Design a protein with these regions (language model features):
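A short, conserved acidic/glycine-rich loop-to-beta-strand motif
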Residues: 109
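Acidic donor-binding/catalytic loop of UDP-sugar-dependent glycosyltransferases
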Residues: 93-106
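Short beta-strand-to-loop acidic/aromatic patch adjacent to the donor-nucleotide binding site
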Residues: 83-92
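Acidic helix N-cap motif at the loop->helix transition within catalytic regions
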Residues: 16-17, 39-48, 98
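Short, well-formed alpha-helical segments that are part of the catalytic scaffolds
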Residues: 9-26
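Glycine-rich, basic loop-to-helix element that forms the pyrophosphate-binding segment
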Residues: 61-78
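Cell-envelope/extracellular polymer assembly enzymes that use nucleotide-activated donors
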Residues: 2-4
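A conserved acidic beta->alpha catalytic loop
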Residues: 34-45, 63, 93-94
Length: 109
């Protein structure tokens, strides 16, 4: 299984990075699609995500085109890069304890 995650961001705060840390190690790659208008964007401190080096793709177009547009971009990227599964997440999504590992076992079985 090759797993791409996508998180759709809209005015993200620092909690997003903590949420990402709960599942990033289990993903092959993670696309962060920012729907925040370009004039309001701020950089997230992704350097603290040790499991993210080379795994995080930052994207967006500087305007809010909605969830569908971001998901379409993720699907196109997944197909072009040999991913077998796509995990869609909201910026508030997080996993506690070993919940994500249990989730992956369920998908594989």
């Amino acid at each position: 299984m090759k797993l791409l995650g996508i998180v759709i961001l809209y005015y993200p705060d620092d909690a997003v990075v903590k949420n990402i840390a709960t599942y990033l190690a289990q993903l092959d790659e993670l696309m962060l699609w920012d729907n925040t208008p370009a004039t309001d964007r701020r950089d997230l401190d992704l350097d603290s995500l040790e499991d993210g080096r080379g795994k995080i793709i930052l994207d967006g177009c500087g305007e809010n085109l909605g969830i569908g547009s971001a998901l379409n971009k993720a699907v196109a990227y997944a197909r072009a890069n040999g991913f077998t599964h796509l995990l869609t997440l909201d910026q508030d999504s997080c996993f506690g304890g070993r919940n994500f590992e249990s989730y992956l076992r369920a998908i594989r079985s």
